[in-house]
Amino acid sequence: MSGGRWISNLRQVFGRSRASISSSLLPFPPTSISSGFHVPRLLDAWKNPVAAAAAFRLPQSSGFATMNQLIRHGREEKHRSDRKRALGKCPQKQGVCLRVSTRTPKKPNSALGKIAKVRLSNRNDVFAYIPGEGHNLQEHSMVLVRGGRVKDLPGVKFHCIRGVKDLLGIPDRRRGRSKYGAEKPKST
């Protein structure tokens, strides 16, 4: 029996129009349909349960704060760590090595950067880079720390100064000796 003949038979029995019969056969009253539900999706719900779930999905938030939320809570400022603050407005600070380790740099570079976790005299803990080839630092060594980040190593924003305190300079270095605490070579 086709759908049209079936509805016409029902109309004869109940004396209703086609629209009122089809609306009464829906799973929900017409008031709920007119209040925001999508009618074609509801009609497809008989065949497809996934479509039925999509028909009753609640609207999701857009991700922006409403005016009431802004009035109640306001905007939070992002706090960035200030690397100058660790040295306390000083050009250098003395500190004690807590740990000496290596760290791999960001892409595309490849190495093992030597770093030391240092507790400064103002009780701030920082990661400091140990420049040059080879070093004699170990736990409880005293070092002098200056500012200056290492671009490849995330979180390393200080440098250890070579040739001062317990960190020895690099022996037999000819060029850039002042940066690595190397002594002037004996002229022969």
Swiss-Prot record:
Gene Ontology CC, one term: mitochondrion
Localization per Swiss-Prot or TrEMBL: Mitochondrion
CDD domains referenced in this protein's UniProt entry, alphabetically: Ribosomal_S12
Record keywords: Mitochondrion, Ribonucleoprotein, Ribosomal protein, Transit peptide
Signal sequence region: none
Any Gene Ontology biological process: translation
Domain of life: Eukaryota
Cystine residue pairs: none
A GO MF label: structural constituent of ribosome
Transit peptide, residues from-to: 1-63
Note in the entry: In this plant the mitochondrial S12 gene is nuclear encoded.
PANTHER family registered for this protein in UniProt: 30S RIBOSOMAL PROTEIN S12 FAMILY MEMBER (PTHR11652)
Function: Protein S12 is involved in the translation initiation step.
Family recorded in the similarity comment: Belongs to the universal ribosomal protein uS12 family.
Name by which UniProt lists this protein: Small ribosomal subunit protein uS12m
Species this protein is from: Oenothera elata subsp. hookeri (Hooker's evening primrose)
Gene: RPS12
